Amino acid sequence: MNALASTSRDGVAALGALIGVGLGPGDPELVTVKAARLIGAAKVVAFFAKRGRESHARAIAAPYLAPDCEEIALHYPVTTEIPFDQPEYVESLQRFYEDCVTRIRAMLEAGRDVTLLCEGDPLLYGSFMHMFARLDQRFRIEICAGVSGMSGCFAAARQPMAWGDDILTVLPATLDEDRLASRLAETDAAVVMKLGGNFAKLRRAMIRAGVIDRAIYVERGAMPGEKIMRLKDKRDDDAPYFSMALVPGRGRRP
């Protein structure tokens, strides 16, 4: 990577590289050997965070950060009062991602590599993908795979998820109730992400699909404060960002 930040043969500064590093589900010990090496070597580290809160990605990577690295915090806009399917929500996030691109691009054009920390895997429901889509045509981008958040939840819940020829479906809970119920009914096993303010709707969809009795609720899987229970036993409809619902498969076994 250092060669990317050097001077080219004609004396013009070479462009830097964007390095997306997957951090795994939350436990720093689930950071891969390669990710730890890349983080430790990074001169510029960027990470997403909610304004006024510690970055979860930075907290995971903290044991591996070089003490003299430059840090760039990318603070999400406050969108909790705007429904995700409204134009204002999309426009707010679009402006945010364009601002992030501007900041990162300035570093890359100056010949500096930027390591962008990503919870879970960089290419699964991650903000890194928005940087990748906007910068890939001009800059070199390296991607270090991470243990997915769902894998961390499988292990935390001690749930075999897909047997034999089971079909495993990954769903965002932001879908409308009818689509959730339909998808849950037609698959063998499911992972439902982005529970947030969608838990009551998901519960209803699972009852309609006939899977509520085998659904597992995992909150903060592979993180401090981990909670695991049968979904039907959860008494309230509050679900934080770091929560998932699992519907284990029951397919062919030897």
Locate the predicted segments by residue.
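Short, acidic/turn-prone active-site loops that include or flank metal/cofactor-
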Residues: 25-26, 50-52, 76-77, 147-149, ...
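Class I SAM-dependent methyltransferase SAM-binding "motif I" and its flanking Rossmann-like core
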Residues: 120-186, 236, 249-253
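General beta-strand structural signal in soluble alpha/beta enzymes
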Residues: 47-48, 73, 116-118, 143-146, ...
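Conserved beta-strand scaffold positions in the cores of enzyme catalytic domains, especially
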Residues: 18-20, 71-73, 141-143, 170, ...
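A contiguous loop/helix-start segment that scaffolds small-molecule binding in enzyme catalytic cores
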Residues: 18, 184-254
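Class I S-adenosyl-L-methionine
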Residues: 2-28, 33-138, 223, 228-229, ...
